[in-house]
Amino acid sequence: MHNLADIIAATNLYNCGDYFQAELICTKIIDTQLDNSDALCLLGRIKYQLSKNQIASTTDAGLRYHLWYYNNQIWNTTTWAGVKALKSPCDMWNYQEIIWDLKPSLILEFGSFFGGGTLFFASLLEKINNKSQVFSVDIDHTSLNPQVRNHPRIELMLSSSTAPQVSQRIVELRREFPGPIFAILDSNHEKQHVLGEMQLLRPLLQTGDYVVVEDSNINGHPVLPGWGEGPYEAMEEYFAIYPDDYQRDDLREQKFGFTFATAGFLIRR
């Protein structure tokens, strides 16, 4: 009965346009009752309205597209060679241009998931560098496509991306595949984890190496306001400690009008 009264109160707030208070009530209900269909349904309607209002409030074409593309989860349908990639095609095109120019011998990917991105990077390496490898790290490989598991240019590690064995293996791979590194951070998006990834890479990278910090668009940069501190805030803290480590590649970030890697295209100094 308590939840029913809360649902009625949240619905009344929603109908009055007070979406934030309605969202707060629904979230509290779901925290204690994950399968409450009324709260889940109303929360979906609230998020749709918030997204719609956010898009309507801006005249920036790139921002409008970013919000539409992200909030409608079009990114969740993107694939490479039939394998889910979960990325922005604009970012992927940017990556291939960066990789073609950089010609890395080693690509580091923190966060494999289905493996579409992993396969994409391996496909690029086949075109540009005879002696090269993708090293992809994730805590769970159960969703990986067989194409990824069996690819000769892909090495997988089942581990947290901040674990010491990851650093040790990168040192070994750097000896085996000398040359530039392209690294992409796309695993756990919580601030402290991303900060740990950046700190792990700090002694391993050389001048000219390239790092992309993905999903720094969350927590209101510009999507998912209120998500909590994530990659963007991790970069802010990192640069407060090490202000001279990287140069931001603003031209790349701005090239297509929007990116999932807000402020996250970085060249090692």
Where are these regions (language model features)?
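Helix-start (N-cap) detector for alpha-helical repeat units in TPR-like alpha-solenoids
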Residues: N3-L4, S37-D38
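Alpha-helical segment of the N-proximal tetratricopeptide repeat
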Residues: L4-K28
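TPR/TPR-like alpha-solenoid repeats
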Residues: N12, I46-L50
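Mobile, glycine- and charge-enriched loop segments
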Residues: Q49-W93
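S-adenosylmethionine/decaboxylated-SAM
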Residues: T78-V83, P89-R269
